[in-house]
Protein backbone atom coordinates (compact mmCIF):
# COMPACT_ATOMS: atom_id res chain seq x y z
CA UNK A 1 0.00 0.00 0.00
CA UNK A 2 1.14 3.49 -0.86
CA UNK A 3 1.03 5.93 2.08
CA UNK A 4 0.30 9.47 0.82
CA UNK A 5 0.07 12.76 2.68
CA UNK A 6 -0.74 16.31 1.63
CA UNK A 7 0.70 19.43 3.26
CA UNK A 8 -0.41 23.05 2.86
CA UNK A 9 2.84 25.03 2.53
CA UNK A 10 0.97 28.34 2.58
CA UNK A 11 -0.52 27.54 5.97
CA UNK A 12 2.88 26.53 7.33
CA UNK A 13 4.38 29.79 6.04
CA UNK A 14 1.56 31.76 7.65
CA UNK A 15 1.30 29.92 10.96
CA UNK A 16 4.72 28.54 11.86
CA UNK A 17 6.57 30.37 14.62
CA UNK A 18 9.68 30.38 12.43
CA UNK A 19 7.89 32.35 9.70
CA UNK A 20 6.29 34.71 12.22
CA UNK A 21 9.67 35.35 13.86
CA UNK A 22 11.23 36.09 10.47
CA UNK A 23 8.46 38.61 9.70
CA UNK A 24 8.91 40.30 13.07
CA UNK A 25 12.69 40.48 12.51
CA UNK A 26 12.19 42.13 9.12
CA UNK A 27 9.68 44.61 10.53
CA UNK A 28 11.92 45.51 13.46
CA UNK A 29 14.94 45.93 11.18
CA UNK A 30 13.20 48.00 8.51
CA UNK A 31 10.36 49.66 10.45
CA UNK A 32 12.36 52.65 11.75
CA UNK A 33 13.77 53.39 8.30
CA UNK A 34 10.29 53.13 6.76
CA UNK A 35 8.89 55.58 9.32
CA UNK A 36 11.78 57.97 8.62
CA UNK A 37 11.05 57.83 4.88
CA UNK A 38 7.34 58.43 5.52
CA UNK A 39 8.23 61.47 7.66
CA UNK A 40 10.51 62.82 4.92
CA UNK A 41 7.72 62.27 2.38
CA UNK A 42 5.30 64.26 4.55
CA UNK A 43 7.86 67.04 5.08
CA UNK A 44 8.52 67.27 1.34
CA UNK A 45 4.80 67.39 0.62
CA UNK A 46 4.34 70.18 3.18
CA UNK A 47 7.31 72.12 1.72
CA UNK A 48 5.87 71.71 -1.77
CA UNK A 49 2.42 72.92 -0.71
CA UNK A 50 3.95 75.92 1.11
CA UNK A 51 6.09 76.74 -1.94
CA UNK A 52 3.02 76.63 -4.14
CA UNK A 53 1.17 79.05 -1.83
CA UNK A 54 4.16 81.38 -1.46
CA UNK A 55 5.21 81.33 -5.12
CA UNK A 56 2.97 84.27 -5.99
CA UNK A 57 5.09 86.58 -3.84
CA UNK A 58 8.43 85.30 -5.19
CA UNK A 59 10.58 86.56 -7.98
CA UNK A 60 11.14 84.28 -10.95
CA UNK A 61 14.69 83.52 -9.76
CA UNK A 62 13.50 82.63 -6.24
CA UNK A 63 10.71 80.44 -7.62
CA UNK A 64 13.09 78.61 -9.98
CA UNK A 65 15.60 78.08 -7.17
CA UNK A 66 12.91 76.69 -4.86
CA UNK A 67 11.50 74.44 -7.61
CA UNK A 68 15.01 73.07 -8.25
CA UNK A 69 15.50 72.42 -4.51
CA UNK A 70 12.17 70.59 -4.36
CA UNK A 71 12.99 68.52 -7.49
CA UNK A 72 16.38 67.60 -6.03
CA UNK A 73 14.79 66.68 -2.70
CA UNK A 74 12.18 64.56 -4.53
CA UNK A 75 14.89 62.74 -6.52
CA UNK A 76 16.90 62.11 -3.35
CA UNK A 77 13.84 60.80 -1.52
CA UNK A 78 12.84 58.60 -4.48
CA UNK A 79 16.37 57.16 -4.57
CA UNK A 80 16.33 56.48 -0.82
CA UNK A 81 12.90 54.84 -1.07
CA UNK A 82 14.09 52.61 -3.92
CA UNK A 83 17.20 51.58 -1.97
CA UNK A 84 14.99 50.84 1.04
CA UNK A 85 12.62 48.69 -1.04
CA UNK A 86 15.55 46.83 -2.60
CA UNK A 87 17.14 46.17 0.81
CA UNK A 88 13.84 45.10 2.40
CA UNK A 89 13.00 42.79 -0.51
CA UNK A 90 16.46 41.22 -0.44
CA UNK A 91 16.20 40.58 3.31
CA UNK A 92 12.69 39.20 2.85
CA UNK A 93 13.91 36.80 0.14
CA UNK A 94 16.75 35.58 2.37
CA UNK A 95 14.40 35.06 5.33
CA UNK A 96 11.79 33.34 3.15
CA UNK A 97 14.43 30.96 1.78
CA UNK A 98 15.66 30.22 5.29
CA UNK A 99 12.14 29.53 6.58
CA UNK A 100 11.29 27.45 3.50
CA UNK A 101 14.36 25.31 4.15
CA UNK A 102 13.31 24.72 7.77
CA UNK A 103 9.75 23.87 6.69
CA UNK A 104 10.83 21.50 3.91
CA UNK A 105 13.30 19.76 6.22
CA UNK A 106 10.53 19.32 8.78
CA UNK A 107 8.15 17.91 6.15
CA UNK A 108 10.83 15.41 5.09
CA UNK A 109 11.53 14.44 8.71
CA UNK A 110 7.81 13.98 9.40
CA UNK A 111 7.38 11.95 6.22
CA UNK A 112 10.31 9.68 7.03
CA UNK A 113 9.35 9.24 10.70
CA UNK A 114 5.77 8.33 9.79
CA UNK A 115 6.49 6.05 6.85
CA UNK A 116 5.05 8.15 4.03
CA UNK A 117 5.86 7.10 0.49
CA UNK A 118 4.70 10.39 -0.99
CA UNK A 119 3.90 13.85 0.40
CA UNK A 120 2.28 16.32 -1.98
CA UNK A 121 1.64 20.04 -1.62
CA UNK A 122 -1.96 21.17 -1.37
CA UNK A 123 -3.69 24.44 -0.56
CA UNK A 124 -3.53 27.54 -2.74
CA UNK A 125 0.21 27.15 -3.41
CA UNK A 126 0.12 23.43 -4.03
CA UNK A 127 -0.30 21.15 -6.97
CA UNK A 128 -3.12 19.05 -5.50
CA UNK A 129 -6.56 20.50 -6.15
CA UNK A 130 -8.70 18.15 -4.11
CA UNK A 131 -7.95 15.53 -1.48
CA UNK A 132 -9.51 13.84 1.50
CA UNK A 133 -8.99 15.63 4.78
CA UNK A 134 -7.56 12.42 6.22
CA UNK A 135 -4.54 12.86 3.93
CA UNK A 136 -3.75 16.35 5.27
CA UNK A 137 -0.64 16.28 7.48
CA UNK A 138 -0.28 20.07 7.77
CA UNK A 139 -1.42 20.26 11.40
CA UNK A 140 1.01 17.53 12.45
CA UNK A 141 3.94 19.18 10.65
CA UNK A 142 2.98 22.55 12.15
CA UNK A 143 2.94 20.98 15.62
CA UNK A 144 6.49 19.69 15.04
CA UNK A 145 7.63 23.11 13.83
CA UNK A 146 6.13 24.67 16.96
CA UNK A 147 7.75 22.07 19.21
CA UNK A 148 11.18 22.63 17.67
CA UNK A 149 10.98 26.43 17.65
CA UNK A 150 13.24 28.20 20.08
CA UNK A 151 13.02 31.99 20.12
CA UNK A 152 16.38 33.65 19.61
CA UNK A 153 16.11 35.37 23.00
CA UNK A 154 15.53 32.03 24.74
CA UNK A 155 18.69 30.43 23.43
CA UNK A 156 21.49 30.35 25.99
CA UNK A 157 24.31 32.79 25.53
CA UNK A 158 27.67 31.18 24.86
CA UNK A 159 29.74 31.23 28.01
CA UNK A 160 33.24 32.68 27.83
CA UNK A 161 36.00 30.12 28.17
CA UNK A 162 37.96 30.33 31.40
CA UNK A 163 41.43 31.80 30.99
CA UNK A 164 44.15 29.26 30.35
CA UNK A 165 46.16 28.42 33.43
CA UNK A 166 49.82 29.21 33.16
CA UNK A 167 52.32 27.08 35.06
What is the predicted function of each stretch?
Residues 127-131:
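A structural signal for short loop-to-beta-strand junctions that line the ligand-binding cleft
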Amino acid sequence: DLKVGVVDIGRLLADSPQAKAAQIAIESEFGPQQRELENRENELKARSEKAQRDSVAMSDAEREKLEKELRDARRDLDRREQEFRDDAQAKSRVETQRVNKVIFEEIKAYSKANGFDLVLTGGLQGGVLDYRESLDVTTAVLAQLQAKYKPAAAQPMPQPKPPAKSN
